[in-house]
Amino acid sequence: MKTLKNTCNEKGEEIYMTRKEFQEFIAKGKMILDGATGSNLQKRGMPTGVCPEEWILEHPDVLVGLQREYIEAGSDVLYAPTFSGNRIKLEEYGLADQIGEMNRKLAGLSFEAIRQADTDRQVLVAGDITMTGQQLYPVGNLPFEELVDIYKEQIGYLVEAGVDFIVVETMMSLHECRAAVL
């Protein structure tokens, strides 16, 4: 786990926290998460019906600015804008072959927001994942094992990018949630 700690030292080198320091950080009693990223991006120009991940990569300053505002408002955790960055959702936009590059770059934007923020506080980045929009077999055609692999793939890219932890959110199916955490 590469957990960024107060971003850089006086030499400009990135500083990382240990597992014990991470556990102490989350045990402090409360963590303030960032806000409603999708709706705030729409207020700042992201049209409906586009691939949010692609739009953010085309307009990185919008996301970085929004996340800097969250930090300055007191957020301890930024969600990387990887909400629907799984292979199935990206395939809807013809972007499945870019899953690794997109997830790494999107997480990197959150780290950039931390670097640019005017704070001495430690801020963490969570890799954010959600449902695929596909129904699992026998209701749908998606085998459970394939769904596990889809989530493992996205999580793997987020871990490569250095996120501090993974958030699984907005799941409508207990089985899909289970696949994401396996």
Model-derived regions: residue spans:
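Domain-level signal for soluble alpha/beta catalytic cores
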Residues: 4-182
